[in-house]
Regions:
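Divalent-cation
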Residues: 6-9, 13-187
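Conserved small/polar residues in nucleotide/adenosyl-binding loops
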Residues: 188-194
């Protein structure tokens, strides 16, 4: 199940808890391991492969890609995985009737850090009524962070993404790859993507 967080005050508190400190807002480091959290072409390809393979067999999935705002508060609601991201790992996690398939996966750099995570649901009236909990959770987390969230529909097998409070439905693999390519290796030398401009 995905926990519903109704109160705006609670959602705002979680958003504030997710903000990085001064140093981590400029460097995409995993300080626990002393290395840069890289989001490589291989990781992108594995992600895209997993999403469309799951789509073919209508396996529902909810994958949150962390960007500059750390999602530790949501990560702690799930079960630690800390494994290198591969398409097979993601497919295994979301396989129906497995212990980890319910809830969201959080990805940081090239690693799946947590599964079965609880996310806030959007209360936006612009979301189509035919969309389920996964899509509302994807938009919800995108409203309180700069994450990119991928949804695979269990009903249709279609892939959608949520960014900046907006849902992009039924996207193809090239569109997804393009959006994932904005996830930086380091914030010191890359321009922030358009979605973060004000």
């Amino acid at each position: 199940a995905i926990v519903i967080i109704f109160q705006p005050e609670i959602r705002k508190a979680l958003e504030n808890l997710g903000q990085k400190n001064f140093l981590t807002s400029f460097f995409a480091f995993d300080f626990s391991k002393g290395e840069i959290a890289k989001f490589t072409d291989k990781t992108i390809n594995e992600l895209v492969k997993a999403c469309y393979e799951m789509g073919k067999v209508k396996t529902g999935a909810l994958i949150v890609i962390e960007d500059e705002i750390v999602l530790s508060e949501y990560e702690r609601t799930g079960i630690a995985v800390d494994g290198i991201l591969t398409s097979q790992l993601l497919i295994n996690i979301f396989e129906k009737n497995t212990p980890l398939h319910d809830g969201a996966v959080i990805v940081r750099g090239d690693r799946v850090v947590s599964a079965t995570c609880y996310l806030p649901l959007t209360d936006s009236l612009s979301i189509s009524k035919d969309l389920g909990t996964r899509h509302r959770a994807a938009v919800g987390i995108s409203e309180v962070s700069d994450s990119l969230t991928i949804v695979v529909s269990e009903e249709t097998g279609k892939v959608s993404i949520a960014m900046g409070g907006e849902l992009y439905r039924n996207v193809d693999a090239e569109f997804l790859k393009n959006k994932l390519s904005f996830i930086p290796v380091s914030y010191t030398h890359l321009t922030l993507p358009t979605k973060l401009e004000v």
